[in-house]
């Protein structure tokens, strides 16, 4: 199955696949996502998001309603849509190849989850989050999912994402390469990010969030494994 991501920073005709390492794909705008509306979105006739015999699930986050701004908080100027109330931003930038440089994300303070992809190369999706002290791969390109990836990673500082090269700079900051990052910051009573230890029992651990969650995503972080997504729909 194809898992597709669209956003208004990159343009709605440009698709990335979260379950593959393929490059950003630009189709005829009449094929897939054709419009972002005030109360939803419109689809074209492409069989991936709109096959007449299939049922689909989709999740949406509002950033800044499609209005971007230039952000110079980091060493690299980024284009940002940020929703500080919801703790979510979309960041696009062009890498400069300098190890340790930073890029602004538009949310105050430190981020909690950052999902980042090189748009023009078949580099891995890179994921870092609070509570793991690790970088995990959304997809490793071979059908598997890897934990403890250390060839490139992101660090936290107030207002910026640190882009560190430990052997594969193209994943996060290759010279003249284009990137997108989806950045989340925890908002009390609305979102929660962290880790827990399983016990292998049918009476599993209670994971405190402080609210009734509508959407949960989890995966094992000490070994390879699949990401699992649950929602109330």
PLM region descriptions:
Residues 1-233:
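Surface-exposed molecular-recognition determinants
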């Amino acid at each position: 199955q194809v898992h597709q991501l669209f956003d208004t920073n990159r343009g709605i005709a440009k698709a990335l696949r979260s379950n593959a390492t393929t490059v950003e794909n630009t189709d005829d705008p009449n094929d897939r996502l054709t419009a972002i509306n005030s109360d939803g979105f419109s689809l074209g006739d492409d069989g991936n998001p709109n096959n007449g015999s299939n049922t689909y699930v989709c999740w949406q986050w509002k950033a800044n309603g499609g209005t971007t701004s230039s952000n110079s908080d980091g060493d690299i100027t980024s284009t940002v849509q940020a929703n500080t109330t919801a703790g979510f931003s979309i960041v696009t930038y062009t890498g400069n190849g300098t190890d340790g440089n930073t890029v602004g994300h538009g949310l105050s303070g430190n981020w909690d989850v950052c999902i980042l992809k090189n748009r023009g190369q078949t580099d891995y999706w890179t994921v870092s989050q609070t509570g793991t002290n690790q970088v995990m791969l959304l997809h490793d390109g071979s059908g598997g999912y890897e934990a403890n990836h250390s060839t490139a990673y992101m660090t936290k500082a107030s207002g910026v994402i640190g882009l560190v090269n430990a052997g594969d700079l193209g994943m996060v900051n290759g010279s003249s390469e284009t990137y997108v990052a989806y950045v989340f910051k925890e908002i009390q009573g609305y979102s929660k990010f962290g880790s827990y230890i399983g016990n292998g029992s049918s009476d599993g651990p209670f994971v405190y969030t402080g609210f009734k969650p509508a959407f949960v995503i989890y995966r094992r972080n000490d070994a390879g494994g699949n990401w699992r997504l649950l929602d109330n729909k």
